[in-house]
Design a protein with these regions (language model features):
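Acidic, mature catalytic/reactive cores of soluble proteins
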Residues: 1-231
Length: 231
């Protein structure tokens, strides 16, 4: 039989293009014919584009793009689906936000809570997953300078609440403000204030040291690699 195309809207469209537009949307749609495709469709719902920038929403209905949640979830929402280009799109926006933060410039991007102490360490972890999915060489070429800048920012003690002590561990103060994933608050105060050598921060720190040291050594920067190995 013949197809009938019906369109209703608040503005005029060219009728002869309706079928072509519909078919293009159907082709772009993720089918719901398997458990994998249902997961893939759900993953795509967390992607958010605004003004040419790419973000990952922390959740629905009210969460925005939160830095820690973005870096933790980014590999699973992109690389696990063989969508390397989507990872790079989000990281392109994230890199600009990171550089604004470490250079103490006004935040011009809609990524919130960038100041939390472990965010940069999670960014390194996300890039480590990118290196596993693509190659260490590709990661070094595309993100090597960013990784080195993050490492120097931490090692030079420029973060306002992430302090590298002489024992090689990172210290953070969460007495008055929730700074970890355990971020519930009552009357503006953290329910579980965490201060000190927070275990996951230092696990991420050790991981970042080893990953970046190996990466830069493979790229010929033996001096920096030796410094990180001795950290």
């Amino acid at each position: 039989g013949e197809s009938i195309v019906f369109s209703a809207g608040t503005s005029e469209v060219t009728p002869r293009r309706l079928k072509q537009t519909f078919e293009a949307e159907v082709a772009d749609r993720t089918p719901r014919d398997s458990f994998y495709h249902c997961l893939k469709n759900s993953a795509h719902q967390f992607h958010n584009q605004q003004e040419g920038e790419h973000y990952i929403l922390a959740g629905y209905p009210w969460f925005k793009c939160r830095a820690r949640d973005m870096f933790i979830s980014l590999p699973g929402l992109t690389l696990a689906l063989d969508e390397v280009d989507q990872f790079e799109d989000v990281m392109k926006t994230a890199e600009k936000a990171i550089r604004s933060f470490i250079n103490d410039e006004p935040a011009g991007y809609k990524i919130y809570e960038m100041e939390h102490p472990d965010v940069l360490l999670w960014a390194v972890w996300a890039l480590q997953q990118y290196a596993k999915e693509t190659s260490r060489e590709q990661c070094r070429q595309k993100y090597g300078e960013l990784l080195k800048d993050i490492m120097e920012f931490i090692r030079q003690r420029r973060h306002e609440n992430l302090f590298l002590h002489d024992n090689g561990l990172l210290f953070a103060n969460g007495t008055d403000k929730a700074i970890t994933w355990m971020n519930s608050t009552v009357n503006g105060h953290p329910v579980i204030p965490r201060t000190g050598y927070i275990v996951e921060f230092n696990a991420l720190w050790y991981n970042a040291l080893r990953f970046i040291a190996d990466l830069v050594r493979e790229g010929g920067d033996v001096y920096l690699a030796d410094e990180l190995d001795a950290q």
